[in-house]
Amino acid sequence: MGNPGDRVSLGETWSREVHPDIDSERHSPSFSVERLTNILDGGIPNTELRRRVESLIQRDPVFNLKHLYFMTRDELYEDAVQKRFHLEKLAWSLGWSEDGPERIYADRVLAGYNNLNLHGIAMNAIRSLGSDEQIAKWGQLGKNFQIITTYAQTELGHGTYLQGLETEATYDATTQEFVIHSPTMTSIKWWPGDLGRTVTHAVVLAHLICLGARHGMHAFIVPIRSLEDHTPLPGITVGDIGPKMGFENIDNGFLRLNHVRVPRENMLSRFAEVLPDGTYQRLGTPQSNYLGMLVTRVQLLYKGFLPTLQKACTIAVRYAVIRHQSRLRPSDPEAKILEYQTQQQKLLPQLAVSYALHFMTTSLLQFFHSSYSDILKRDFSLLPELHALSTGMKAMSSDFCAQGTEICRRACGGHGYSKLSGLPTLVTQAIASCTYEGENTVLYLQVARFLMKSYLQAQVSPGSIPQKPLPQSVMYLATPRPARCPAQTAADFRCPEVYTTAWAYVSARLIRDATQHTQTLMRSGVDQYDAWNQTSVIHLQAAKAHCYFLTVRNFKEAVEKLDNEPEIQRVLQNLCDLYALNGILTNSGDFLHDGFLSGAQVDMARTAFLDLLPLIRKDAILLTDAFDFSDHCLNSALGCYDGHVYQRLFEWAQKSPANTQENPAYKKYIRPLMQSWKPKL
């Protein structure tokens, strides 16, 4: 499990002893926390490397996080830029590779607190969409920070709907340049991170126009600021968009382009190029230009969304064994709030979601790495499935993380509202993830289109026409299933085969219903686009069920592979059961709709769910310890490893500048008002 002393890293001298209420939770563990940590990390070497990197970060005073809660917006920005460049110097000195695990582990500690993350996203876009020559040129400049880049896609008037973007790139054959222009107010690029005050270049998404013909969205490298004095270049209007709900350290910006010229070579050209005379040549599918977004979404799953919920669970569960409230019996002392079933019902499903998403993300990463190299070689056969999986998992993961972090915050009562708990920061980070890199409803509907096509493909009679095999993730659509659930007792609902089959049945039924509703409208004469719009709510429901089914099935399969770890397999099986049953109870109407489940069976599922809560509660602290977040990484007064919540809250509050600075409002307003009443007293 590592050295517990390494986890208590915030410097309080009184924190060398662990609070007995949390210490008792770690006595006589039912499984090896250290071994589960190794499994989550993908092996002992990864755990050891991650801890070395985290220890390096935590010992460096530049990476101190404690003071951030008391900083102004400008101070947060400057501090985050300093952290990023200090990290780069550290990486260079230690020989870390650009895409190596060390940087991922460093980001795990500093997540949300270091700037220039969009520089990495823009570099990924260049590596995904650029030619070998462009990668050699721009990749090296970006790696050395000779240029600083952002990815400029979203506009004031459009975001997820890429075809609606208005920025134009018109090719001028006489000069062999592209003229990049924002033709309307709504075409101003809006929201790109680091654009407001920092970057020198942007990867700009714009509609390509050649010889009067439009060829869809393409990516262009556009200089934004002078490399000499950082002033905006001619034709560039750029700035900061102002305060936001969160991420106040990041200078999200706007960019207006007024006929800005860039060389022909600045269009990223792995999958399409414009010849000197203006002839357009496509070298891939139209969807291949979205590959940069796909890479970003996959990375966000394990670098952004998942750690946010894992941290929130760790904080809330630890606080729940320190906080005592009311009595279970009149003669008892006040109980830990985690003893209450209602608190377990709030927190333990979030813990189950954290583990379910971990194994789903691991599986998706494996599929991504196996197919990405083929896509770069212009083999696009797996691109539709990879797009559907990454899009669906982005939507579901960010939705669940946003919901889960807020549930964890509320479960901590009033103290959860304090920034010192660390939870408000996690909540605002998670909420933002539901709309950046694609608004989730739109993303679910993209998945739904893939599902409708797959369902129709699955219904084609064998041998009638040449048929491509169904993608692996939707092969279940062609598999017959019983029309009724066979479960007869609550214990039956703890059988993975029972609930996995139930989820497969309901997902397939919803996909079928959505498709048939759309087709019925079209047969009645409704235009296909109107028919889609009029059934989009049903399609949305089907896409969500499909994504949930995939995580249930994947979690089940991941647990089955742990036969050589029986203690860990047991506790993870409980979490898998809880995840599947919580989804069934939350969406019980879908399972009752056509009688697949009866009302009595839903009651059985609820009994099975409630029976799981005390079993998982016994291991809850150990399951959060297995995430192996240090105190530095959590930056939470409520969630520290030692459990000294109240001392830490009080000590941190003393650091507020309001406690040491003179109160100007007293002289200006309070004292004059109070003195005006003196003669009357």
Swiss-Prot record:
GO terms for biological process: bile acid biosynthetic process; fatty acid beta-oxidation using acyl-CoA oxidase. Gene3D superfamilies: Acyl-CoA dehydrogenase/oxidase, N-terminal domain, Butyryl-CoA Dehydrogenase, subunit A, domain 2, Butyryl-CoA Dehydrogenase, subunit A, domain 3. It is an enzyme of class 1 (oxidoreductase). Residues 14-28 have a biased composition (Basic and acidic residues). GO terms for molecular function: 3alpha,7alpha,12alpha-trihydroxy-5beta-cholestanoyl-CoA 24-hydroxylase activity; acyl-CoA oxidase activity; FAD binding; fatty acid binding; flavin adenine dinucleotide binding; protein homodimerization activity. InterPro entries: ACO (IPR034171), ACOX_C_alpha1 (IPR055060), Acyl-CoA_ox_N (IPR029320), Acyl-CoA_Oxase/DH_mid-dom_sf (IPR046373), Acyl-CoA_oxidase (IPR012258), Acyl-CoA_oxidase_C (IPR002655), AcylCo_DH-like_C (IPR036250), AcylCoA_DH/ox_N_sf (IPR037069). The modification Phosphoserine is found at S9. Keywords: Acetylation, FAD, Fatty acid metabolism, Flavoprotein, Lipid metabolism, Oxidoreductase, Peroxisome, Phosphoprotein. Its cofactor is FAD. Pfam families: ACOX, ACOX_C_alpha1, Acyl-CoA_ox_N. Acetylation of Lys-667 is observed in liver mitochondria from fasted mice but not from fed mice. Its EC number is 1.17.99.3. One of its GO terms (cellular component) is peroxisome. It catalyses: (25R)-3alpha,7alpha,12alpha-trihydroxy-5beta-cholestan-26-oyl-CoA + A + H2O = (24R,25R)-3alpha,7alpha,12alpha,24-tetrahydroxy-5beta-cholestan-26-oyl-CoA + AH2; (25S)-3alpha,7alpha,12alpha-trihydroxy-5beta-cholestan-26-oyl-CoA + O2 = (24E)-3alpha,7alpha,12alpha-trihydroxy-5beta-cholest-24-en-26-oyl-CoA + H2O2. It is found in: Peroxisome. The modification Phosphothreonine is found at T13. Homodimer. Belongs to the acyl-CoA oxidase family. Oxidizes the CoA esters of the bile acid intermediates di- and tri-hydroxycoprostanic acids. Capable of oxidizing short as well as long chain 2-methyl branched fatty acids. This is Peroxisomal acyl-coenzyme A oxidase 2. It comes from Mus musculus.
